From Swiss-Prot:
Gene name tied to this protein: pgi
Record bears the keyword Cytoplasm: yes
Gene Ontology CC, one term: cytosol
Enzyme class per UniProt: isomerase
Lineage: Bacteria, Bacillati, Cyanobacteriota, Cyanophyceae, Synechococcales
Annotated family: Belongs to the GPI family.
Compartment(s): Cytoplasm
Protein name: Glucose-6-phosphate isomerase
Pathway stated in the Swiss-Prot or TrEMBL entry: Carbohydrate biosynthesis; gluconeogenesis; Carbohydrate degradation; glycolysis; D-glyceraldehyde 3-phosphate and glycerone phosphate from D-glucose: step 2/4
Originating organism: Parasynechococcus marenigrum (strain WH8102)
Length: 551
């Protein structure tokens, strides 16, 4: 089995007489299961990663039917990597693959910018950890407060949970929501160490409300304690965005670039994921190298020998091409506990679309959930085995255990973990449930990069198979607009109530001139529930009776 690359193809199994020759699925015949396992197994020798789709109900006839669709998907992916407008709704290129192989970028300026950014991030991380770059008071930085939403929060959280070793780099704290209680808890935990905390704000446009609100709360707390905000603030944003201009004008400690052609859910190999990796002492170049290796393996225009294509085909067949089965992610390692949440965004934001590229209403998508094994075996696996058959499982295992957890009385925790995975996989198969498995010899930055790249490419292929734009998010934008409308309505409601006169929600709506009674009730219930200067009189069980006023 040779090392994979452009001239050496990853091993994909043996015993097949033709390109689509393997036995049809059988839940009861162990020899057929073994034959399918041998025939369908994909293996990357250098990465030490296996993909097994043999327990998915994929038969040769399915792959033959999907071949024309994959021919188009392979061509579309090649065009995307070459710089085509792959996101036509927003007239944008899609370039996250360039981030780990800069020579693919369409021009020298972009290639140089990517390479320079990686060098700067790597050096900045080293300088912060070593104390060369110091906090405003002259002490070394002790912590990082990371402010980001969506992929700008999930990607960094995955990097930290998956790669940070004990005592390695700086401890991380997150503002990844606008929950006041959550912010308060983080700030209370930092307490006096806030003065030696590096505060990183991530916002591509610089105008997203959630990171802006988190940033202002952090700035207020720093400055209220006499700190110098600019000397401990870092921005990750697009050049000349609102946030970038503020950082440049106020002299922030550092700014790193986000690119118009990288979406949040695929930004983990940009500064969004590389900076947290650098700040915990992870090998970010190895992380990028792993992603690049998997990218190379998944460029192969051969359905049977491309792991991302095999995954996408399995998803398609399992859900009849309409997302009729959920994806349950079961990583049997604590370090990958966040991975199911990461995949939730990557898969659901990419594939959950109302319209296809031709404007037809299709309501596509694959729901994703999961936590970790073997914890999940004592939670929802009961339903997976005996309940509604509306899912397929994705098992993820790491073979190599740590050396400091010994075998005691002939019992090894790693053996039990492996046994639990195999047992659950077998029990699901016996119950007619589908699953695929990803196995890794070891887990480190390189394998994490490869794992992420595998799913990124599979999502792209699946999007092409079902003819949807996997690179925009109109539903998210619709939610942002609706939220902005509610906040605008709230400001007008508060203006009406300034005269102090008690009003029902219906009377408030009439005075405002638009909005709905229900929306106004929700607004007023929130305001009255906090110390914001509003009173509510009436029966809460009868919302129409309550009269709200400004005290």
């Amino acid at each position: 089995m040779g090392k994979p690359g452009r001239s050496s193809i990853p091993s994909v199994g043996v015993h097949h007489q033709g390109p689509m020759s393997f036995p049809d699925f059988s839940a009861s015949d162990a020899q057929i299961q073994w034959q399918r396992f041998c025939d369908l197994l994909w293996y990357h020798e250098d990465l030490g990663i296996w993909l097994d789709i043999s327990r998915m109900h994929v038969n040769p006839s399915h792959l033959e039917q999907l071949q024309p669709g994959f021919d188009k998907a392979f061509a579309a992916m090649a065009e995307l990597e070459a710089g085509a407008i792959a996101n036509p709704d927003e007239q944008r290129q899609v370039g996250h693959y360039w981030l780990r192989t800069p020579q693919l970028a369409p021009n020298e300026a972009v290639r140089d910018q990517i390479a320079t950014e990686i060098d700067q991030i790597d050096q900045f991380g080293r300088d912060v950890i070593s104390g060369v770059i110091k906090a405003p008071g002259g002490q070394p930085f002790t912590d990082v407060l990371w402010i980001g939403i969506g992929g700008s929060g999930l990607g960094p959280l995955l990097m930290i949970r998956a790669l940070q070793g004990h005592g390695s780099g700086l401890p991380f704290h997150f503002f990844d929501n606008v929950d006041p209680n959550g912010m308060s808890a983080v700030l209370a935990e930092l307490d006096d160490r806030l003065a030696t905390t590096l505060v990183v704000t991530v916002s591509k446009s610089g105008g997203t409300p959630e990171p802006h609100l988190g940033m202002e709360q952090a700035r207020h707390r720093v400055e209220s304690r006499g700190g110098r905000w600019a000397d401990q603030a870092v921005a990750i944003t697009m050049v000349d965005s609102k946030l970038d201009r503020e950082a440049q004008q106020d002299g922030w400690l550092k700014s790193f670039s986000m690119f118009d052609w990288v979406g949040g859910r695929t930004s983990i190999t940009s500064a969004v994921g590389l900076l947290p990796g650098a700040l915990i002492g992870a090998d970010i170049r190895d992380f990028l190298a792993g992603a690049a290796q998997m990218d190379d393996a998944t460029r192969l225009a051969d359905l049977r020998r491309n792991p991302a294509a095999l995954m996408a085909a399995s998803w398609f067949v399992a859900g009849d091409g309409k997302g009729r089965r959920d994806m349950v992610v079961l990583p049997y390692r604590d370090r990958l506990e966040v991975f199911s949440r990461y995949l939730q965004q990557l898969v659901m934001e990419s594939l959950g679309k109302r319209l296809d590229r031709d404007g037809n209403e299709v309501n596509q998508g694959i729901a994703v959930y999961g936590n970790k094994g073997s914890t999940d075996q004592h939670a929802y696996v009961q339903q997976l085995r005996d309940g509604v058959d509306n899912f397929f499982a994705t098992f993820i295992e790491v073979l190599e255990d740590v050396s400091d957890i010994p075998v005691i009385k002939d019992e090894c925790p790693g053996d039990f973990l492996d046994g639990f995975l195999q047992g659950t996989r077998s029990a699901l198969t016996e119950g007619g449930r589908q699953s695929l498995s990803i196995s890794m010899r070891r887990f480190d930055a390189r394998r994490l990069g490869a794992l992420i790249a595998l799913f990124e490419r599979a999502v792209g292929f699946y999007g092409d198979l079902v003819n949807i734009n996997a690179y925009h998010q109109p539903g998210v934008e619709a939610g942002k607009k609706a939220a902005a409308a509610i906040l605008d309505l709230q400001s007008r409601v508060e203006a009406v109530l300034k005269d102090g006169a008690p009003r029902t929600v219906s009377e408030i709506r009439q005075a405002v001139g638009d909005g709905s009674d229900e929306a106004i009730f929700w607004i007023m219930r929130h305001l009255a529930g906090n110390d914001r200067g509003y009173r509510a009189e009436g029966d809460w069980a009868n919302p129409a009776s309550i009269r709200f006023s400004c005290s």
